[in-house]
Amino acid sequence: MSKNERMVGISRRTLVKSTAIGSLALAAGGFSLPFTLRSAAAAVQQASEKVVWGACSVNCGSRCALRLHVKDNEVTWVETDNTGSDKYGNHQVRACLRGRSIRRRINHPDRLNYPMKRVGKRGEGKFERISWDEALDTIASSLKKTVEQYGNEAVYIQYSSGIVGGNMTRSSPSASAVKRLMNCYGGSLNQYGSYSTAQISCAMPYTYGSNDGNSTTDIENSKLVVMFGNNPAETRMSGGGITYLLEKAREKSNAKMIVIDPRYTDTAAGREDEWLPIRPGTDAALVAGIAWVLINENLVDQPFLDKYCVGYDEKTLPADAPKNGHYKAYILGEGDDKTAKTPQWASQITGIPVDRIIKLAREIGTAKPAYICQGWGPQRQANGELTARAIAMLPILTGNVGISGGNSGARESTYTITIERLPVLDNPVKTSISCFSWTDAIDHGPQMTAIRDGVRGKDKLDVPIKFIWNYAGNTLVNQHSDINKTHEILQDESKCEMIVVIENFMTSSAKYADILLPDLMTVEQEDIIPNDYAGNMGYLIFLQPVTSEKFERKPIYWILSEVAKRLGPDVYQKFTEGRTQEQWLQHLYAKMLAKDPALPSYDELKKMGIYKRKDPNGHFVAYKAFRDDPEANPLKTPSGKIEIYSSKLAEIARTWELEKDEVISPLPVYASTFEGWDSPERSTFPLQLFGFHYKSRTHSTYGNIDVLKAACRQEVWINPIDAQKRGIANGDMVRVFNHRGEVRLPAKVTPRILPGVSAMGQGAWHEANMSGDKIDHGGCVNTLTTLRPSPLAKGNPQHTNLVEIEKI
């Protein structure tokens, strides 16, 4: 057993024997196991310590409450929500192993403590300590110079999700305090989309006008649950998440659950009735094969299609559509491609047997209501926009939209208590790019156009990005694609001239900073955080500083206020409005109380720590009002109906500049894509590769916590058939490589992944000698992913990759 396998009195073997999650959570919080070794005296001593409410506000989205025990200005141990009856519908918001390990993040020896400036090349991680005055003066001077020389469009706030839950501390670029500062100083280049949901958020509004789904709790009214790539047991596994609600809802309904995923996930893991492994990027082909059976066996809901939909057949096809341009013609082989989408056709593409496709179609066609949903993995493909719209066709064809127990085909919705956010003000700059295209905007911004690159607000960019704010995010490098190419672009200082990083640790992104500033964590400052991704129970968490400020770490509001001072008294006044961070919170909460008098007072919430409220409507049913009365409650589509055929997409397909292997279609069709299952490149790189969300991290956050790394090792999943061909045994060190880069890590040989497919947890910290061989020993999947965006959303296709794996 290696030294990394035994920490804080708990071995990996013991963890596994103890069902891992619960035991590890306690260990990460500072306990030693077994529990009997804890003396009663120690328990009494801990109970008498000061307890401060905090929260884990990272981008799993669930935002769990933490009770941090503090002694002598140090966090000694961590527990979680202990309020209420802990019954279904009013459950305790219990943090997972990540949140419970926050003490290790707070006290980590690698915390950033002082402002620093770069003294080596970008990416080398060489810095020297400077004063706050020098750091702030440098930032303000560079920002002024950039705006004077290039204009505000040359300033960019990098995509970030390190603090999605916070209000004053929120890092989301469109809603952060950084955005407010820039809007007080003439604005900055906008961005649209996200690394999580670019394709589905773009595509579903063409069908429904929005991207809503029924709440998970509504599964208690379902007869069948079909999940395409939806894995809440790992992506939303905490007490604030929906895994518990999924289990409870199925207990009530006894609904059969079918999981469709290339990987046998923990959401399946014995909970499912059936797992159907599928080749990545082929979900739309499976849907088409199912649709063929539904149509030919008269299992479609024709009255629903006639009344609520546009483009299913010739009766509702828009006048501007070509003859036989409807969905039914596409499925039956009467459209342009003259290919019937039979189960045999679908089986060759998906790898799912013909008889199972037919059986699944009949199950979907006869079980009503059926809850058909998709996670965000299937859409994070190069053809993800088509996939998202295609999966939505199953509830549309069967009339499961807008009813209790049904769904729209989207991911589940949650009930939240709306909070009053720090206003970011209007951005004078109206130009925007896809959040995934920022490296292009640095490298060749003025060549980017609306019809080729998705520039919005004008026909083309006028200037490249010259100044980057990177606050509480690792998307500058680690979470962006093709790290080696990104490194090449960022290291050229003649392109982007200033990078400001505000962080807690020396992340992969922080190594590329010109000025690096030490931020406080959310638990070290006052803030109010709402829930998200938490079923039908909303809550608010009041965070108080768990300790005093240490070293020279500062909160984001203070940092930006000081920059604002240096930009001019008018900017400072407009940014702060004369308020401190605490005064802003009180001001914003007063607005919340005026709109929602049922909320506790500010002081009451501060004392409570957490306030919970169940959805007064019980469950959220997406598009129920439309289903009940489509005339009075039209959808936000051009027709006001569900648009199976989208004239808007037809126009985009006709006018945009696309590559030969890119498809934008008015119908939710299946299309092959670059680096897909049928790509000619498979002769060199035969394995499909995708990343998945891993228990030990939320993206890259918590990726440096040793106890989590020991319990949840970074490995590449490979099927025994593929491993045997390569002479690979479980635990062997292997090289995973393609023409973009190489990663070295252990192999996990398991039948839990489809032959021909490999996978690794995304978010591992990139560790490579970037002035040498560039081989990544940290296991970061983005060493291997592509910078080429998807056709419509111009979004992140990080699950579309081909690789080879060899034993070292």
Language model regions located:
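Extended redox/cofactor-interaction regions of prokaryotic respiratory oxidoreductases
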Residues: 2-3, 173-260, 267, 285, ...
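A glycine-rich phosphate-binding loop feature that marks nucleotide/adenosyl-phosphate handling sites
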Residues: 160-161, 307-310, 364, 407-418, ...
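Long, well-ordered, tryptophan-enriched scaffold segments
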Residues: 263-367
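Phosphate/diphosphate-binding loops
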Residues: 497-498, 545-564
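Catalytic or ion-translocation cores adjacent to nucleophile or general acid/base/metal-coordination motifs
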Residues: 520-545, 755-756
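Long, contiguous, secondary-structure-rich segments that constitute the structural scaffold
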Residues: 556-608, 700-702, 706-717, 721-808
